[in-house]
Amino acid sequence: MSRFLRPAFRLATTATRASTIRPTPSSLITKAAAVPTTRLLQKRSYAAEATGVKEYTVREALNEALAEELESNPKVFILGEEVAQYNGAYKVTKGLLDRFGEKRVIDTPITEMGFAGLAVGAALAGLQPVCEFMTFNFAMQAIDHIVNSAAKTLYMSGGIQPCNITFRGPNGFAAGVAAQHSQDYAAWYGSIPGLKVVSPWSAEDAKGLLKAAIRDPNPVVVLENELMYGVSFPMSEAAQKDDFVLPFGKAKIERAGKDLTIVSLSRCVGQSLVAAENLKKKYGIEAEVINLRSIKPLDVEAIVKSVKKTHRLLAVESGFPAFGVGAEILALTMEYAFDYLDTPAQRITGADVPTPYAQKLEEMSFPTEQLIEDYAAKMLRV
């Protein structure tokens, strides 16, 4: 067991940004902006040179994961709004109704409280439901079922009554949908005992983490991102097999480096990789980029090991700054690697405001490649 799993008091920090460091409108997080990141990864990926590698979108990877689990386990079923006849709001469940039938792929009324309650009840009865939310913003209607029923039953029953359920759907930034559809709930669910929380970035992340979630006896929250569904990644031959799963609590080093550690999750990983390449081209800086994959459990050992090598830490997330994932990462780094830091650890987050609908204001509400680059350059004094 990791020596980093002991309880600890959490630190609250306030980051003051320099007036010269501001998001650039041209760096708006969009689907188009995600494409260069993918091309960059294809050039540097070991998988791109291997035999049997195929291109998968994140959507296709999720669809394949669901199909494989439905095929292999009769206890697995999917329910949610428009998941069946419409093939899902984002087409993640495309073709599954035709293949597995209406008893395994179930359309529900527009009532998150209702179908989440049905899903939790089914899990307590021994089935393994995959409960899709059209967006995790709507899951607030079902928060009692997730937090009080699914997350707590195993503990309250003394380990007798498991609740094998997967909650999945898009989370975080989604361009042009304003305050009630753009929130990042990683910190919310990550703070709840009894829940496991993952947030995929690449196609391999999406498939491996979703399959692991469905197979896990605990309730798992899978936080996807709407803007990543259509982005393509190389999928290794191993990841294409139906036994491919990724372990929880294990981060992945997407880019090795020696000067700075950038820890990120979900689509911010791609932004961090673009910023890291720009830092190398402009200043010769080699930044190490860590893809968390798993929020709870968190791979503290990977973060600490990297910080001991680079002596600098920058956490990047799209959530609100107060009590967020970045704040937790900084607090843990202070506890376990403080003596190795050459400069105070920093974090980049979404703005502490409800997400504006106006495009120019929206652009300034989330991390951008330029903002990450500026923060890193300031930390390294270049």
Curated annotation (Swiss-Prot):
InterPro entries: PDHB_mito-type, THDP-binding, Transketo_C/PFOR_II, Transketolase-like_Pyr-bd, Transketolase_C. It is found in: Mitochondrion. GO terms for molecular function: metal ion binding; pyruvate dehydrogenase (acetyl-transferring) activity. K(+) binds at residues 165, 213-214, 216, 218. GO terms for biological process: pyruvate decarboxylation to acetyl-CoA. GO terms for cellular component: mitochondrion. The keyword Oxidoreductase applies. SUPFAM superfamilies: Thiamin diphosphate-binding fold (THDP-binding), TK C-terminal domain-like. It catalyses: N(6)-[(R)-lipoyl]-L-lysyl-[protein] + pyruvate + H(+) = N(6)-[(R)-S(8)-acetyldihydrolipoyl]-L-lysyl-[protein] + CO2. Eukaryotic pyruvate dehydrogenase (PDH) complexes are organized as a core consisting of the oligomeric dihydrolipoamide acetyl-transferase (E2), around which are arranged multiple copies of pyruvate dehydrogenase (E1), dihydrolipoamide dehydrogenase (E3) and protein X (E3BP) bound by non-covalent bonds. The Chaetomium thermophilum PDH complex contains 60 E2 units, 12 E3BP units, about 20 E1 units, and 12 or more E3 units. The units are organized in 1 E2 60-mer, 4 E3BP trimers, about 20 E1 tetramers, and a maximum of 12 E3 dimers. Its EC number is 1.2.4.1. Thiamine diphosphate binds at residue 112. Its cofactor is thiamine diphosphate. The 10-megadalton pyruvate dehydrogenase complex contains multiple copies of three enzymatic components: pyruvate dehydrogenase (E1), dihydrolipoamide acetyltransferase (E2) and lipoamide dehydrogenase (E3) and catalyzes the overall oxidative decarboxylation of pyruvate to form acetyl-CoA and CO(2). Within the complex, pyruvate and thiamine pyrophosphate (TPP or vitamin B1) are bound by pyruvate dehydrogenase E1 subunits alpha and beta and pyruvate is decarboxylated leading to the 2-carbon hydrohyethyl bound to TPP. Residues 1-46 form a transit peptide. Coiled coil: none annotated. This is Pyruvate dehydrogenase E1 component subunit beta, mitochondrial. Keywords: Metal-binding, Mitochondrion, Oxidoreductase, Potassium, Pyruvate, Thiamine pyrophosphate, Transit peptide.
